[in-house]
A protein has these predicted regions:
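Gly/Ala-rich beta-loop-alpha elbow adjacent to hydrolase catalytic centers
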Residues: 143-152
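Alpha/beta-hydrolase active-site loop
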Residues: 114-134
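Acidic catalytic loop of the alpha/beta-hydrolase fold
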Residues: 271, 300-305
Length: 356
């Protein structure tokens, strides 16, 4: 028996066991490329260039009269709100009786270098909003995530003709005076914005993603694979959920140079939005013009859009009905993490129900 124990704990056996565990890690990571995402059926009801306006299919008639239009970040795949079964904010909103629409900006490339926020807001988004409102026969709820939230905010400030009934912002940076490490790294004296946008007609998705990962270099780098190796030993570990999330994180979308120049230069570097100096198509974007009910969602441990950046919106709008909820988690985790279905989704759902 003693010899058997020695053989069992021999360096060779331990080495083989470690090799097998890390082989599982490699196979899991490689399999992420084929992870099934975006499971909720949907139809394209409008398109322009690369952008698509989707309406998610319902199996029963809507019981809420106010539809929800989701506005996504320009640099991420839109399926994050419909990641997989059990991790789909879209599916939750459908279950609550809403008609749900989503504006997917698509995959930009070099031919889109001149696209800027003026065009995206006043041509793409304006048409999408009017189409949803026309189909619904009334105003809608705008739900914006991250950069998509900033775009939705600008639109709401510019268009006060009654199209927007409610505005919901998820981890949306608004005031960049204290934007955390990312704000420091994008200061004009250290960040080569003009060089970057002149070299790249569409800034590769990997570049903004590198900035995000550098905010937490160990957890976002080798640390994620060390944690994966540990989790793969757990019988109840959701491998398919991990693969879907890993796929999304690593499928960045190129950022048109015109948009990127505005986003970094006018928002991060010069903080024009809260100063009332931002102009879209020759019109000033004044946050004080926003009077609709506003729900601002902040992630407690968000390093991409820290709380000073996101909470500021409440002090600039004229909405009498405005609220903020702080959800435990990070920039992405609050939307699709384990606690999303029991924390964020019900809170947003109840807020919308009371304003339907």
């Amino acid at each position: 028996q003693a010899l058997e124990k020695v053989a069992h704990y021999s360096p060779l056996n331990q080495g083989l066991s470690l090799f097998e565990h890390w082989l599982d890690v490699v196979n899991t990571v490689q399999g992420a490329r084929d992870a099934v995402v975006g499971p909720t059926p949907k139809e394209v009801i409008w398109r322009k260039n690369k952008a698509r306006l989707y309406r998610y299919e319902r199996t029963t008639p809507a019981t809420r009269k106010t539809p929800v239009l989701c506005i996504m970040p320009l640099i991420n795949r839109a399926y994050i709100l419909d990641l997989r079964p059990g991790a789909s904010f879209v599916a939750y909103l459908l279950s609550q009786g809403h008609d749900v629409y989503l504006l997917d900006w698509g995959e930009w490339n070099d031919e889109d270098r001149s696209l800027n926020l003026d065009v995206l807001i006043e041509q793409y988004m304006a048409r999408a909003v009017r189409m949803v409102a026309r189909r619904a026969g009334g105003p809608l709820t705008l739900l914006g995530y991250c950069i998509g939230g900033a775009v939705a905010t600008c639109f709401s400030a510019l268009h006060t003709e009654g199209l927007i009934k409610n505005l919901v912002l998820l981890t949306t940076p608004i005031d960049f005076a204290d934007a955390g490490p990312f704000g420091v790294w994008t200061r004009p004296e250290v960040f080569p914005l003009e060089l970057l946008t002149s070299v790249f007609p569409a800034v590769p998705g990997a570049y903004p993603d590198i900035g995000s990962k550098l905010l937490q270099p160990l957890p976002a780098g080798i640390g994620q694979f060390v944690r994966l190796e540990e989790k793969l030993r757990e019988p109840r570990f959701d491998v398919y959920g991990w693969q879907a999330m890993f796929r999304w994180v690593n499928e960045g979308v190129a950022f048109p140079a015109g948009c990127y120049r505005q986003w970094i230069g006018e928002f991060y570097q010069r903080n024009k939005l809260v100063r009332g100096e931002l102009q879209i198509s020759g019109r000033k974007v004044l946050l004080s013009n926003i009077r609709c009910p506003l729900l601002n969602v902040v992630a407690s441990s968000d390093v991409i859009a820290p709380r000073p950046t996101t909470s500021a919106i409440l002090g600039h709008v004229s909405s009498e009905d405005k609220a903020e909820i702080i959800v435990k988690g990070g920039h992405v985790g609050i939307v699709v993490g384990k606690a999303a279905a029991t924390d964020l989704w019900p809170k947003v759902g109840e807020w919308l129900r009371l304003r339907d």
